[in-house]
Amino acid sequence: PLDGFMMGSRTGTLDPSVVTFIMEKEHLTPSEMDQILNKKSGLLGISGVSSDDRDVTKAAAEGNQRAQLAHDILEYQISKFIGGYLVALGGCDAIVFTAGVGENQSHHRQVVGEYLKFLGVKIDPELNEKMVLGKEGKISTPDSSMEVYVIPTNEELVIARDTKALVEKL
């Protein structure tokens, strides 16, 4: 589960030749390399602080350059993936930020909005700041080319609904 943008302790998408290069250079076993890719990379590996973005955010605010670099990379990667999907889909009506970072880190959403500004995406800074800690709502400006929302994740509800649907088929 490494594909996509960088996660708390996972690399996200990377060039496969990097894996063998590092293994050979550092004399690592496949198991050791797997641990690095899945448990010691991502925000943790780059920041050197934590896999929890709240800790990385605090460190970046205190001037930790590695923590800031981790944020810069994460925001770039999120923007790149949104851009890639916009091309694949031929556009979209809305962008939705969800899950831990998407729901609770307004600064990441604001930076991603800046990356997407050339597409006409506009995030309202005041609305964006208000949409944290379980709040749900629209954060784009009225003249944005796409609507942008923050919607909290409810994985337990999805699991419960899927389980109910499966049980009803028995």
What feature does the model see in each segment?
Residues F5-G12, I46, Q68-H71, G102, ...:
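Hydrophobic alpha-helical scaffolding
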Residues P1-S51:
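Glycine-rich phosphate-binding loop plus the immediately following alpha-helix
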Residues G42-I46, D53-A88:
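Adenine-nucleotide phosphate-binding core of ATP-dependent small-molecule kinases
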Residues G134-L170:
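Structural signal for terminal/edge beta-strands and the immediately following C-terminal loop/tail
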Residues G120-L133, S140:
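Enzymes that bind and transform nitrogen-containing heteroaromatic metabolites
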Residues D93-Y115:
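Glycine-rich phosphate-binding loops at beta-strand->alpha-helix junctions
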